[in-house]
Amino acid sequence: MSTEEVSDAMGKTGVVKGSKPIAKGQFAVGVVQYVYTYLDSNWAIHEQIRDLRKDVIVFVDDINVTDKALFGQLVSRFIIQKKNAKAIVTKGWMRDVQGMIEDGTMVWCKDITPIGCFNKKEEITPEIEQIMKKNREYYDGSIAVCDDSGVVIIPKELITEEFLEKLKFLHNQESVWFDCVMNKNWDTYDTVCLKKYKDESSK
């Protein structure tokens, strides 16, 4: 199941804007555990990743972080190899990317930079705490689907049998479209817009 199909099933929503893989050909899906940091510091990340659950996708929220890497190879190794998480997703920046690629670490992030956050404890403000609580409610316990196109989040309220059936329908429809265009030599207008295959199936 691709991120495109999942997003389509949610009315073309759910994308983690700007988050892309550091290496091609990777795929991960799993329950999200939410981690956050703020104000150009990664102190809070070090605190929270001690308590990661196994087999989760770690979503790292960067609140008021100004184009600095949240962490690099050391922390990613701890998250993946020691805490047994599946993958790391963030809308923020990362560093030590060559090392993470060599490790085979699956990471989706906004961009890369050699400049990292400060390892300094910062006091959380009421405004940041409010943002954190809102984002934690949305991300924690949701499902992340990650591939070469990016990351899509399935909110907790959509984790239902009904939504699963919708995903299956769209996946099958995609197969029908490819069959019509590639094997039956239809054009995309007849296939996608007019859906003429429905007329064939009703005969």
PLM regions: where:
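Conserved beta-strand-loop-short alpha-helix elements that form
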Residues: 139-151
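Feature captures the catalytic cores and cofactor-binding loops of soluble hydro-lyases/lyases
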Residues: 1-140, 154-188, 192-203
